Swiss-Prot record:
This is 2-isopropylmalate synthase. The gene is leuA. PANTHER family: 2-ISOPROPYLMALATE SYNTHASE 1, CHLOROPLASTIC-RELATED, HOMOCITRATE SYNTHASE-RELATED. GO terms for molecular function: 2-isopropylmalate synthase activity; acetyl-CoA C-acetyltransferase activity; manganese ion binding. Pathway: Amino-acid biosynthesis; L-leucine biosynthesis; L-leucine from 3-methyl-2-oxobutanoate: step 1/4.
Amino acid sequence: MESHIQIFDTTLRDGEQTPGVNFSFDERLKIAKQLETWGVDILEAGFPASSAGSFKSVQAISNTLTKTAVCGLARCKKSDIDAVYEATKDAVKPVIHVFIATSPIHLTHKLKMTQQQVLESIKEHVSYAKQYFDVVQFSPEDATRTDTDFLIKCVQMAVDCGATIINIPDTVGYSYPNEYGRIFKTLIENINSKQDITYSAHCHDDLGMAVANSLAAIENGAKRIEGTVNGIGERAGNTAIEELALALYVRKDHYGNETRLKLSETKNTSDIISRYAGIRVPRNKAIVGQNAFSHESGIHQDGVLKNPETYEIMTPQLVGISKNDLPLGKLSGKHAFAEKLKSLGYDIEPQNQAELFKQFKAIADKKKSVTDRDIHAIIQGTEHEQNAIYQVDTLQLQFVSNGLQSAVVVIKDKNGNIYQDSSIGTGSIVAIYNAVDRIFKHKSELIDYRIDSVTEGTDAQAEVHVSLTIEGQPVNGIGIDHDVLYASCKAYVEAHAKYASEINKKEGNH
């Protein structure tokens, strides 16, 4: 059997625990399809028992994917296991992920259980899960702070009861490569099983070592890595799958193993997650950041021009970044636009290209040239707005006096209902956001506001990122438009729409 490092993607489960991130039902389906295109082996679609909305999205993903294994998370509770079974039973490859905490601090303060009670719970619930699933994965939560002898007992119990995947979570990002690698070596040497056991690594990045720890696990026998796209996740995030995959590819001379990811889909996957999560990828991010293949130093530039391998250990094309960014202009027609969409990997029916072409022409009238990044922004922005609960319809601004501005904001929902209100503020942005708050009637507080440009130049499209709390809940929003104020309004409305979507999801609506 061909050996490869399996990728277990938990963007839709652990990744969504990032503060402010709330994927809509439609976004979750689109992300799942893209992850299947990228080639992940297993997709953890969610925690079905947590809410009616989560159950429905896991169920929909299970019914949609045609090649990828779909996994649901369950505590050591029979009701959780039942929920995962019902949500994933129609998946082409259903998998259950059962977990329980094993560290002293968790046993004492969270579970209030003894070690013996934990072992009995593992026995009861892994055995129960095995009645419904051919593939059962078990995780001892906070494994890296668990006594080694007790960890061995927990894993052995899970294996004896039918678990064939053993995942070792560094839940709080506490471990370091040598230590984490030794845990795998110890388990592999001490666990007895008549079946083949796959060992999996799940690392958090609190100390900045998630990818390094995952690679150490591979060096010590792990065959599966859990992670998220762009490394999103609670606190400092999770193992960034794209970084792990490219490390294995570039240094296959050392690791001797690779993933089966379609690496040319890496940048596209990263962009989609960035867009839907409302979190911009840092410019200096490894693999997918804007500066990943940029060279400022004259010496470096000279070397790259003579031979790219002087300062580039991989090509931009490898991860799906096109070097042939031939811009379109205001004289470009529908055929040229359609060919550009095709070259960028978009499969859009001709009848659905009309609105996109209209947006392209509007931008082309304002810019000297429309680049690939502009096109990506148009596509992703349009898809996102089409799926949004609310969209900005019109925005009017007027100077009042003494630095005060008035704003009239009109938005519409999916059903075409119109909502309008106005307000004043010390500047355009404050006035706009006050008006939006009046429309939604929620208590909100702006935490962060940033403007980035989609492309270079004074004629670039603006990309506005906002982070705010609505009724105490953190949410993010992104707005893209050639007009900075309109983009700002879009971002703020999107944040409110995400909050509304989260409320609907908890109530089981989508």
